A protein has these predicted regions:
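Short secondary-structure boundary segments
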Residues: 35-36, 73, 117-118
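Active-site neighborhoods of divalent-metal-dependent phosphate/nucleic-acid chemistry enzymes
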Residues: 67-112
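Short active-site oxyanion
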Residues: 28-31, 64-67, 111
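Anion (oxyanion) recognition and catalysis
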Residues: 25, 62, 107
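Short, well-structured N-terminal submotif of metal-dependent ribonuclease cores
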Residues: 1-33, 46-59, 131
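A generic structural signal for short hydrophobic patches within well-formed alpha-helices
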Residues: 8-9, 38, 120
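Acidic, PIN/NYN-like endoribonuclease modules and their adjacent C-terminal/linker elements
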Residues: 103-131
Length: 131
């Protein structure tokens, strides 16, 4: 499965559904994260919790066995197409920059995507249900 930034942040920020999101992360195999989403998650968590937040992210990644996948040219093109089809200001899904890379990795690996919210459910990507 591919993990979107929103799922990691739900766990790190201890949002109400954090236990269920953490359970979904642990249930998935393999667990992949786009390098673009790692940076996005780092920026958000460190802006809220400082460098300690970054360390919490690193620990979550390590303990969960999440593999970071580099963005290649095919994923970049898939992300461009995703933005054209589902991007903010173009479609109700309103995918942002990071969302487009999560979408691209899921599409390129033919894997479902774990996320929070309702943005990706308005696209054509397969979704991981949160219990």
């Amino acid at each position: 499965m591919v993990i979107d930034t929103s799922a990691l942040l739900a766990v790190l920020l201890q949002e109400p559904d954090a236990p269920r999101v953490a359970q979904a992360i642990e249930a998935g195999s393999p667990r992949l994260l786009s390098a673009a989403n790692l940076l996005e998650a780092s920026i958000v968590i460190e802006s809220r919790k400082g460098e300690a937040g970054g360390r919490e992210l690193d620990l979550l990644m390590y303990r969960s066995g999440i593999e970071v996948v580099a963005v290649d040219q095919d994923q970049a093109e898939t992300a461009r197409v995703a933005w054209r089809r589902f991007g903010k200001g173009r479609h109700p899904a309103a995918l942002n920059y990071g969302d487009c890379f999560a979408y691209a990795l899921a599409r390129s690996r033919r894997m479902p995507l774990l996320f929070r919210g309702n943005d990706f459910s308005q696209t054509d990507i397969d979704c991981v249900p949160v219990p």
